[in-house]
Amino acid sequence: MPDYDLITILGPTASGKTPFAAALAHELNTEIINADSRQIYRGMDLGTGKDLADYTVDGHPIPYHLIDIADPGYKYNVFEYQRDFLISYESIKQKGCLPVLCGGTGMYLESVLKGYKLMPVPENPELRARLANHSLEELTEILKQYKTLHNSTDVDTVKRAIRAIEIEEYYAVHPVPEREFPKLNSLIIGVDIDRELRREKITRRLKQRLDEGMVDEVRRLTEQGISPDDLIYYGLEYKFLTLYVIGKLTYEEMFTELETAIHQFAKRQMTWFRGMERRGFTIHWVSAELPMEEKIAFVIEKLRGN
């Protein structure tokens, strides 16, 4: 029987990975560590798909970590994620449990599964000024020239792209110091969802979250003093809803552009996960359409080495 330190559940948006991870954690009497870069933030709930109800299974609350740990407007980074992941991981292991890591942010997942040695990167005003007038397309092309560590799935705004280039430039000049990060042997389970079903679920989920008050959530964040630029930085829902709230898009334009952007994002997530396989990770894929009991049985079999 393989000796795993961790179970990782990954998959694109709307694949049902969170209810799957919660049901598995319930079965194994363990806890979940979040690996979604935007669910880190308090008050950013509907826009990040933070379905906290998923963390209750058969009336039992499943403990979760790294959700609601930073204020909106803050630029949380992968260096901090590694640090916070380790604290959560060790606290779960001390209870004698096998942690479940769940999310779709490829860079966060890979940073802990591979144990990248990272360090905080300061802002570079000169570089920012030089890149300020470039389009997102031009910045993406610049970013492609690096042997990049950066998560291209999240580079969907000019600010994010400039920050990604800033990080790459810094690492090019400053050798990364050795920093201890434990080698983790994770069983990695990928949730495979049919493309058309994924598209249908994304659209249905978007309409549902808009009905539940996603626009009001963005308005509330701006009323709390979060600048439109800071919200746009988070991309996807926050980018397009903010543009609608400040009058730059009509409701119809916002919906159409956001729907398209989420579909593209899910496609980029799958590209990242396939890239992980090329980089040496073994991902055991399970169909999103299987009944929950069968998905859990699949994981239990893999844990036993079958």
Residue ranges, per PLM feature:
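Phosphate/pyrophosphate-binding catalytic cores of soluble transferases and nucleic-acid-acting enzymes
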Residues: 1-306
